[in-house]
Amino acid sequence: MVKLVLKGNNLSKLIKMSVHREKIDLAKLPHHYDGPVTLAVIGGTGLYDLPNLHPVARLTISTPWGFPSGSITISKTDSGFPVAFLARHGAHHDLLPSDVPSRANIAALKRLGVKAIIAFSAVGSLQQEIKPRDFVLPTQIIDRTKGIRPSTFFEKGFVAHAMFGEPFDLKLNKLISDAIPSKGFLEGFDTDGTPVLHTKENTNNGEDLTIICMEGPQFSTRAESRLYRSWGGSVINMSVLPEAKLAREAEIAYQMICMSTDYDSWNESEEPVTVETVVGNLKANSANACKLAAKLIDEFAAKGGEIGKDLQGSMKYAVSTSPHGVKKELLEKMHFLFPGYWEV
């Protein structure tokens, strides 16, 4: 892992960006919200709120798969566009990656009317050119979880197979890569210059950027890290699955934005990581994530009306089981996600 060098007051400037524009007691917000919310942001390690927006409601939503990781905050932009925010690991980061209630998270967002999700996650870099504090827009996934995380809304007695060849939504990916330049948008300095947003078309010569999803909570051995590099892995985390799979089943467009914190364990030439380095990278990434999210929310509000529409209705025709043979209680459960698809 690399030890970064901060220049001047750049880190302090970045940290100040994460301060709320308004001091609001979230507990006192209304517990209901009328009207659909079409965009959601899921925050990962280091991103626990959207400080550039105006919170208007804080919702606790019960689903057939339990409760989400925490309350869902509805906030509005200056123009009044509503956005849902959910902290993946809970407000106090008390959920292990394997324990995140992903089915409840996605189901609750679906219930709000969400059509697209932009998810943030801290990752380790598997490639030299992806430096700590760089951001990555992955296009492919390799699943190295162990099967202990529930990864589908369907179950015994009701079988469906969602298409997952393109695990991230191509239209949402394009909206993000078109809106954010590879260089010059992300702030902060390290020994190699300003952070870069790595995308398939703009920085990777049209080649896929692949994220490895491991079970955790331990990090990779050096042998594993080198294996993932040999597979063409770009970055590694513990969170993209089953989140992306469940979003696809729920007919929600999904794209993860990865925030690099270190070089995983493959790079023996780098200095040992320090607490100062990790904290500095997380804070800088958090500030840039807030800036990036604010920009992308405005872009989605202006241009994202068609995103997710091509997924609507897709799961109705992905079912292999005749609905007439499905138990009523199971159909009622699926009605939460897909009202009107099958008679209850």
From Swiss-Prot:
Its EC number is 2.4.2.28. GO terms for molecular function: S-methyl-5-thioadenosine phosphorylase activity. Substrate binds at residues 238, 262-264. Its main location: cytoplasm. Pathway: Amino-acid biosynthesis; L-methionine biosynthesis via salvage pathway; S-methyl-5-thio-alpha-D-ribose 1-phosphate from S-methyl-5'-thioadenosine (phosphorylase route): step 1/1. It is found in: Cytoplasm; Nucleus. Keywords: Cytoplasm, Glycosyltransferase, Nucleus, Purine salvage, Transferase. It holds the Pfam family PNP_UDP_1. One of its GO terms (cellular component) is nucleus. GO terms for biological process: L-methionine salvage from methylthioadenosine; purine ribonucleoside salvage. The record marks 220, 275 as: Important for substrate specificity. CDD domains: MTAP_SsMTAPII_like_MTIP. InterPro entries: MTAP, Nucleoside_phosphorylase_d, Nucleoside_phosphorylase_sf, Purine_phosphorylase-2_CS. The keyword Glycosyltransferase applies. The keyword Nucleus applies. It catalyses: S-methyl-5'-thioadenosine + phosphate = 5-(methylsulfanyl)-alpha-D-ribose 1-phosphate + adenine. Phosphate binds at residues 45, 88-89, 121-122, 239. Catalyzes the reversible phosphorylation of S-methyl-5'-thioadenosine (MTA) to adenine and 5-methylthioribose-1-phosphate. Involved in the breakdown of MTA, a major by-product of polyamine biosynthesis. Responsible for the first step in the methionine salvage pathway after MTA has been generated from S-adenosylmethionine. Has broad substrate specificity with 6-aminopurine nucleosides as preferred substrates. Belongs to the PNP/MTAP phosphorylase family. MTAP subfamily. PANTHER family: S-METHYL-5'-THIOADENOSINE PHOSPHORYLASE. Homotrimer. NCBIfam families: MTAP. This is S-methyl-5'-thioadenosine phosphorylase. It comes from Candida albicans (strain SC5314 / ATCC MYA-2876).
